[in-house]
Amino acid sequence: MHFTHDMKYLFIAEKPSLMRDVQACYRNHKQEVTERVGEIDFTALSGHVCTNCMPTDYEEWKDKSWKAIVYPMIPNPWQIKPIADRRKQETLAQIKRRAADYDGIIVGTDSDVEGYGIYWLMEQYLGLNEKPALRFIEHSLTDAEI
């Protein structure tokens, strides 16, 4: 996919503090950023919002005792579920509703394995994997670095 300045992105931050810092920088440099990347809107997670399903979440293992299960347990396909927290589920619902209005996503989770996992689980659960995604990698949260 070719990225152009007329595209519209949803920046999904891992935490509200990161969203506020990046959003403030964006406001200070909006014309320059818009000319290079496009328009950006912001939202924030509060860390993990999805998780892999537990064995008891799968129909084939739901009512079986651990002794009755054949190992290894390899679900096919793997399933993902939202974390059982009302605010996190509301955040997921909001992102799902809003995502259709954007050409792509800017992933603002921490640039480590855990941060990637937070986004990947959410992306798979919400079906965002067809949207182009750009990765925001933070080194520090100063205006110059952002």
Where are these regions (language model features)?
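Intrinsically disordered, low-complexity regulatory segments
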Residues: 1-146
